[in-house]
Amino acid sequence: YLSSRISYLVIILFSFFPLLNILKKDKPEFIIMHLLTSLPILLNNLFKFQTKFILRISGFPKLNMFRKFLWKNSSKNIFKITCPTKDLLSYLKKENIFEIDKMFYLQDAIINIQDYIKKIKENDKVFLDKVESYDHYFLAVGRLTKQKNYPYLISEFINYLKIKKDGILLIIGEGEEKNMLTELIRKNNASDNIFILSNISNVYPFMKKARALILASLWEEVGFVIVEAAFCNLFVISSNCPNGPKEFLENGEAGYLFHSNKKNELTKKLQNFTEVEANLNKLKIKAKKNSSNYTLFRHHLSLRKILLNEN
Protein backbone atom coordinates (compact mmCIF):
# COMPACT_ATOMS: atom_id res chain seq x y z
CA TYR A 1 0.00 0.00 0.00
CA LEU A 2 2.78 2.45 0.99
CA SER A 3 4.74 1.83 -2.21
CA SER A 4 1.64 2.48 -4.34
CA ARG A 5 1.01 5.77 -2.49
CA ILE A 6 4.62 6.85 -3.06
CA SER A 7 4.36 5.96 -6.76
CA TYR A 8 1.14 7.96 -6.95
CA LEU A 9 2.85 11.04 -5.47
CA VAL A 10 5.82 10.69 -7.83
CA ILE A 11 3.46 10.58 -10.84
CA ILE A 12 1.69 13.72 -9.61
CA LEU A 13 4.97 15.60 -9.12
CA PHE A 14 6.33 14.69 -12.55
CA SER A 15 3.02 15.34 -14.32
CA PHE A 16 2.04 18.62 -12.66
CA PHE A 17 3.74 21.07 -15.05
CA PRO A 18 3.28 19.05 -18.28
CA LEU A 19 -0.48 18.83 -17.66
CA LEU A 20 -0.65 22.48 -16.61
CA ASN A 21 1.12 23.43 -19.84
CA ILE A 22 -1.34 21.45 -21.97
CA LEU A 23 -4.34 23.04 -20.27
CA LYS A 24 -2.97 26.56 -20.64
CA LYS A 25 -1.49 26.24 -24.13
CA ASP A 26 -3.82 23.84 -25.97
CA LYS A 27 -6.98 24.83 -24.09
CA PRO A 28 -8.95 21.64 -24.82
CA GLU A 29 -12.71 22.04 -24.66
CA PHE A 30 -13.09 19.03 -22.35
CA ILE A 31 -10.86 16.87 -20.19
CA ILE A 32 -12.09 13.58 -18.70
CA MET A 33 -10.45 12.75 -15.37
CA HIS A 34 -10.23 9.01 -14.73
CA LEU A 35 -8.25 6.79 -12.34
CA LEU A 36 -5.45 9.26 -11.43
CA THR A 37 -7.84 12.12 -10.77
CA SER A 38 -6.26 14.04 -7.88
CA LEU A 39 -3.84 16.01 -10.06
CA PRO A 40 -6.35 17.41 -12.59
CA ILE A 41 -8.79 18.13 -9.76
CA LEU A 42 -6.06 20.02 -7.91
CA LEU A 43 -5.12 22.02 -11.00
CA ASN A 44 -8.77 22.81 -11.65
CA ASN A 45 -9.05 24.19 -8.12
CA LEU A 46 -5.86 26.26 -8.32
CA PHE A 47 -6.25 27.81 -11.77
CA LYS A 48 -8.98 29.10 -14.03
CA PHE A 49 -9.18 27.24 -17.32
CA GLN A 50 -11.48 27.44 -20.30
CA THR A 51 -11.54 23.64 -20.28
CA LYS A 52 -14.54 21.84 -18.80
CA PHE A 53 -13.54 19.07 -16.39
CA ILE A 54 -15.49 15.79 -16.33
CA LEU A 55 -14.87 13.34 -13.48
CA ARG A 56 -15.24 9.63 -14.29
CA ILE A 57 -15.72 7.56 -11.12
CA SER A 58 -15.26 3.81 -11.57
CA GLY A 59 -15.19 0.71 -9.41
CA PHE A 60 -16.49 1.06 -5.88
CA PRO A 61 -14.46 3.95 -4.41
CA LYS A 62 -13.66 4.04 -0.72
CA LEU A 63 -14.90 7.36 0.56
CA ASN A 64 -12.10 8.08 3.02
CA MET A 65 -11.87 11.52 4.60
CA PHE A 66 -9.37 12.85 2.05
CA ARG A 67 -11.33 11.73 -1.01
CA LYS A 68 -14.64 12.94 0.35
CA PHE A 69 -13.14 16.32 1.29
CA LEU A 70 -11.44 16.70 -2.11
CA TRP A 71 -14.54 15.80 -4.11
CA LYS A 72 -16.95 17.87 -2.05
CA ASN A 73 -14.77 20.98 -2.18
CA SER A 74 -14.10 20.55 -5.89
CA SER A 75 -17.67 19.87 -6.95
CA LYS A 76 -18.42 23.45 -7.96
CA ASN A 77 -15.49 23.44 -10.42
CA ILE A 78 -16.40 20.11 -12.04
CA PHE A 79 -18.61 20.25 -15.13
CA LYS A 80 -20.03 16.70 -15.03
CA ILE A 81 -19.59 13.46 -13.09
CA THR A 82 -20.19 10.09 -14.78
CA CYS A 83 -20.50 6.56 -13.34
CA PRO A 84 -20.41 3.20 -15.18
CA THR A 85 -23.21 1.62 -13.12
CA LYS A 86 -26.56 2.85 -11.86
CA ASP A 87 -25.83 1.37 -8.43
CA LEU A 88 -22.70 3.51 -8.07
CA LEU A 89 -24.59 6.58 -9.27
CA SER A 90 -27.31 5.99 -6.67
CA TYR A 91 -24.71 5.42 -3.93
CA LEU A 92 -22.88 8.68 -4.71
CA LYS A 93 -26.14 10.63 -4.84
CA LYS A 94 -27.00 9.40 -1.34
CA GLU A 95 -23.59 10.53 -0.09
CA ASN A 96 -24.49 14.09 -1.18
CA ILE A 97 -20.98 14.94 -2.39
CA PHE A 98 -21.78 16.39 -5.81
CA GLU A 99 -24.63 18.45 -7.16
CA ILE A 100 -27.28 15.98 -8.33
CA ASP A 101 -27.86 17.64 -11.70
CA LYS A 102 -24.17 17.17 -12.59
CA MET A 103 -24.24 13.39 -12.13
CA PHE A 104 -24.92 10.91 -14.94
CA TYR A 105 -24.89 7.21 -15.70
CA LEU A 106 -22.54 6.48 -18.62
CA GLN A 107 -21.95 2.88 -19.67
CA ASP A 108 -18.37 1.79 -20.42
CA ALA A 109 -17.12 1.48 -24.00
CA ILE A 110 -16.30 -2.23 -24.06
CA ILE A 111 -17.19 -3.72 -27.44
CA ASN A 112 -15.26 -2.54 -30.49
CA ILE A 113 -17.29 -4.07 -33.33
CA GLN A 114 -14.44 -3.93 -35.86
CA ASP A 115 -12.05 -5.57 -33.39
CA TYR A 116 -14.66 -8.21 -32.56
CA ILE A 117 -15.20 -9.11 -36.24
CA LYS A 118 -11.45 -9.36 -36.81
CA LYS A 119 -10.85 -11.57 -33.76
CA ILE A 120 -13.86 -13.81 -34.27
CA LYS A 121 -12.55 -14.57 -37.78
CA GLU A 122 -9.16 -15.64 -36.41
CA ASN A 123 -7.50 -17.99 -38.92
CA ASP A 124 -4.19 -18.80 -37.23
CA LYS A 125 -4.15 -22.61 -37.39
CA VAL A 126 -1.92 -23.13 -34.34
CA PHE A 127 -4.20 -20.93 -32.22
CA LEU A 128 -7.40 -22.54 -33.55
CA ASP A 129 -5.98 -26.01 -32.91
CA LYS A 130 -5.43 -24.95 -29.30
CA VAL A 131 -9.05 -23.82 -29.03
CA GLU A 132 -10.28 -27.08 -30.57
CA SER A 133 -8.19 -29.17 -28.16
CA TYR A 134 -10.69 -28.36 -25.39
CA ASP A 135 -14.33 -29.36 -25.45
CA HIS A 136 -17.50 -28.89 -23.38
CA TYR A 137 -15.82 -26.54 -20.92
CA PHE A 138 -16.68 -23.73 -18.54
CA LEU A 139 -14.62 -20.57 -18.98
CA ALA A 140 -13.20 -17.92 -16.64
CA VAL A 141 -11.25 -14.93 -17.96
CA GLY A 142 -9.32 -12.22 -16.12
CA ARG A 143 -6.12 -11.38 -14.31
CA LEU A 144 -5.04 -13.85 -11.65
CA THR A 145 -5.45 -11.42 -8.75
CA LYS A 146 -7.26 -11.28 -5.41
CA GLN A 147 -10.15 -9.31 -6.91
CA LYS A 148 -11.08 -12.16 -9.28
CA ASN A 149 -11.34 -14.64 -6.37
CA TYR A 150 -9.95 -17.63 -8.26
CA PRO A 151 -9.22 -19.76 -5.13
CA TYR A 152 -12.96 -19.72 -4.43
CA LEU A 153 -13.79 -20.54 -8.06
CA ILE A 154 -11.35 -23.46 -8.13
CA SER A 155 -12.57 -24.84 -4.78
CA GLU A 156 -16.20 -24.66 -5.89
CA PHE A 157 -15.43 -26.32 -9.22
CA ILE A 158 -13.58 -29.11 -7.42
CA ASN A 159 -16.79 -29.71 -5.42
CA TYR A 160 -18.72 -29.76 -8.70
CA LEU A 161 -16.32 -32.43 -10.01
CA LYS A 162 -17.51 -34.77 -7.25
CA ILE A 163 -20.85 -34.81 -9.07
CA LYS A 164 -19.67 -34.32 -12.66
CA LYS A 165 -16.30 -36.02 -12.87
CA ASP A 166 -15.77 -35.04 -16.51
CA GLY A 167 -16.25 -31.28 -15.94
CA ILE A 168 -13.67 -28.98 -17.53
CA LEU A 169 -12.75 -25.43 -16.47
CA LEU A 170 -10.46 -23.20 -18.53
CA ILE A 171 -9.00 -20.15 -16.78
CA ILE A 172 -7.49 -17.61 -19.16
CA GLY A 173 -5.28 -15.03 -17.51
CA GLU A 174 -1.96 -14.04 -16.02
CA GLY A 175 -1.01 -12.48 -12.70
CA GLU A 176 0.67 -12.77 -9.35
CA GLU A 177 -1.52 -15.64 -8.10
CA LYS A 178 -0.70 -18.04 -10.94
CA ASN A 179 1.76 -20.23 -9.01
CA MET A 180 -0.52 -20.41 -5.97
CA LEU A 181 -3.52 -21.36 -8.11
CA THR A 182 -1.55 -23.96 -10.04
CA GLU A 183 -0.49 -25.53 -6.75
CA LEU A 184 -4.09 -25.48 -5.46
CA ILE A 185 -5.21 -27.37 -8.57
CA ARG A 186 -2.36 -29.89 -8.24
CA LYS A 187 -2.98 -30.52 -4.52
CA ASN A 188 -6.60 -31.34 -5.23
CA ASN A 189 -5.72 -33.72 -8.08
CA ALA A 190 -7.68 -31.60 -10.54
CA SER A 191 -4.96 -31.06 -13.15
CA ASP A 192 -6.93 -33.10 -15.71
CA ASN A 193 -10.02 -30.93 -15.24
CA ILE A 194 -8.85 -27.37 -14.52
CA PHE A 195 -6.41 -25.62 -16.84
CA ILE A 196 -4.77 -22.18 -16.63
CA LEU A 197 -3.95 -20.73 -20.05
CA SER A 198 -1.67 -17.71 -20.34
CA ASN A 199 -0.52 -15.50 -23.22
CA ILE A 200 -3.96 -15.58 -24.87
CA SER A 201 -4.71 -12.25 -26.56
CA ASN A 202 -7.93 -13.33 -28.28
CA VAL A 203 -10.57 -14.87 -26.00
CA TYR A 204 -13.50 -14.65 -28.43
CA PRO A 205 -12.98 -18.09 -30.09
CA PHE A 206 -12.89 -19.65 -26.61
CA MET A 207 -16.08 -17.79 -25.68
CA LYS A 208 -17.87 -18.97 -28.83
CA LYS A 209 -17.19 -22.60 -27.90
CA ALA A 210 -17.65 -22.55 -24.10
CA ARG A 211 -20.72 -23.76 -22.17
CA ALA A 212 -20.79 -20.74 -19.86
CA LEU A 213 -18.58 -17.99 -18.47
CA ILE A 214 -18.02 -17.95 -14.71
CA LEU A 215 -17.15 -14.73 -12.86
CA ALA A 216 -16.33 -15.16 -9.16
CA SER A 217 -15.06 -11.63 -8.48
CA LEU A 218 -15.23 -9.92 -5.09
CA TRP A 219 -15.94 -6.59 -6.78
CA GLU A 220 -16.37 -5.35 -10.36
CA GLU A 221 -17.69 -2.42 -12.32
CA VAL A 222 -19.97 -3.96 -14.87
CA GLY A 223 -17.32 -6.59 -15.53
CA PHE A 224 -15.90 -6.22 -19.04
CA VAL A 225 -15.62 -9.97 -19.51
CA ILE A 226 -19.33 -10.66 -18.88
CA VAL A 227 -20.27 -8.04 -21.48
CA GLU A 228 -17.90 -9.64 -24.00
CA ALA A 229 -19.25 -13.10 -23.17
CA ALA A 230 -22.86 -12.02 -23.57
CA PHE A 231 -22.00 -10.40 -26.90
CA CYS A 232 -20.66 -13.83 -27.98
CA ASN A 233 -23.99 -15.45 -26.99
CA LEU A 234 -22.29 -17.14 -24.02
CA PHE A 235 -24.31 -17.78 -20.87
CA VAL A 236 -23.01 -15.92 -17.80
CA ILE A 237 -22.78 -17.22 -14.23
CA SER A 238 -21.59 -14.44 -11.91
CA SER A 239 -21.19 -13.56 -8.25
CA ASN A 240 -23.51 -10.85 -6.98
CA CYS A 241 -20.53 -8.73 -5.98
CA PRO A 242 -20.73 -4.96 -5.98
CA ASN A 243 -21.22 -3.24 -8.29
CA GLY A 244 -22.16 -4.06 -11.85
CA PRO A 245 -22.75 -7.79 -12.56
CA LYS A 246 -26.17 -8.03 -10.94
CA GLU A 247 -27.19 -4.84 -12.75
CA PHE A 248 -26.06 -6.18 -16.13
CA LEU A 249 -27.70 -9.57 -15.49
CA GLU A 250 -30.92 -7.87 -14.32
CA ASN A 251 -30.78 -9.51 -10.87
CA GLY A 252 -30.78 -12.99 -12.41
CA GLU A 253 -33.16 -12.39 -15.32
CA ALA A 254 -30.34 -12.39 -17.88
CA GLY A 255 -27.99 -14.96 -16.34
CA TYR A 256 -27.22 -16.75 -13.07
CA LEU A 257 -26.14 -14.94 -9.91
CA PHE A 258 -24.70 -16.61 -6.83
CA HIS A 259 -23.89 -15.23 -3.38
CA SER A 260 -20.36 -13.83 -3.60
CA ASN A 261 -17.66 -15.91 -1.89
CA LYS A 262 -20.20 -18.11 -0.04
CA LYS A 263 -19.33 -21.79 0.25
CA ASN A 264 -21.26 -24.17 -2.04
CA GLU A 265 -23.21 -21.33 -3.72
CA LEU A 266 -21.36 -21.56 -7.04
CA THR A 267 -21.38 -25.37 -6.91
CA LYS A 268 -25.19 -25.33 -6.64
CA LYS A 269 -25.48 -22.95 -9.59
CA LEU A 270 -23.24 -25.16 -11.71
CA GLN A 271 -25.37 -28.19 -10.84
CA ASN A 272 -28.53 -26.31 -11.74
CA PHE A 273 -27.00 -25.05 -14.98
CA THR A 274 -26.06 -28.61 -15.97
CA GLU A 275 -29.64 -29.79 -15.42
CA VAL A 276 -31.34 -27.04 -17.47
CA GLU A 277 -28.55 -25.96 -19.85
CA ALA A 278 -30.68 -26.48 -22.95
CA ASN A 279 -33.48 -24.20 -21.69
CA LEU A 280 -31.61 -20.95 -21.00
CA ASN A 281 -31.90 -19.18 -24.35
CA LYS A 282 -34.26 -16.47 -23.06
CA LEU A 283 -31.70 -15.41 -20.46
CA LYS A 284 -28.89 -15.43 -23.03
CA ILE A 285 -30.93 -13.26 -25.40
CA LYS A 286 -31.54 -10.69 -22.64
CA ALA A 287 -27.83 -10.56 -21.82
CA LYS A 288 -26.94 -10.25 -25.52
CA LYS A 289 -29.35 -7.33 -25.83
CA ASN A 290 -27.82 -5.66 -22.76
CA SER A 291 -24.29 -6.10 -24.15
CA SER A 292 -25.19 -4.04 -27.24
CA ASN A 293 -25.40 -0.97 -24.97
CA TYR A 294 -21.65 -1.22 -24.31
CA THR A 295 -20.31 -0.67 -27.82
CA LEU A 296 -17.96 2.22 -28.56
CA PHE A 297 -20.67 3.80 -30.71
CA ARG A 298 -23.34 3.68 -27.97
CA HIS A 299 -20.83 5.09 -25.47
CA HIS A 300 -20.01 7.92 -27.90
CA LEU A 301 -23.69 8.82 -28.34
CA SER A 302 -24.34 8.81 -24.58
CA LEU A 303 -21.22 10.85 -23.78
CA ARG A 304 -22.09 13.38 -26.48
CA LYS A 305 -25.54 13.93 -24.97
CA ILE A 306 -24.01 14.50 -21.53
CA LEU A 307 -21.39 16.96 -22.77
CA LEU A 308 -23.90 18.91 -24.85
CA ASN A 309 -26.56 18.92 -22.11
CA GLU A 310 -28.99 16.93 -24.26
CA ASN A 311 -30.07 14.54 -21.48
Q: Which residues are covered by each model-predicted region?
A:
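A short, well-ordered alpha-helix in the C-terminal region of glycosyltransferases
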Residues: 265, 279-293
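A conserved mid-protein helix/loop that constitutes part of the nucleotide-sugar donor-binding site
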Residues: 136-159, 167, 176-183
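A conserved, positively charged/aromatic
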Residues: 6-7, 53-82, 97-98
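Aromatic "clamp/platform" in nucleotide-sugar-dependent glycosyltransferases that forms part
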Residues: 199, 218
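Conserved acidic donor-binding segment of nucleotide-sugar-dependent glycosyltransferases
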Residues: 250-252, 256-263, 271-277
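Short hydrophobic beta-strand element within catalytic cores of glycosyltransferases
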Residues: 235-239
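A short, active-site helix/loop in glycosyltransferases that binds the activated sugar's phosphate group
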Residues: 78-105, 110-117
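Short His-centered aromatic/hydrophobic patch
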Residues: 11-15, 33-39, 57
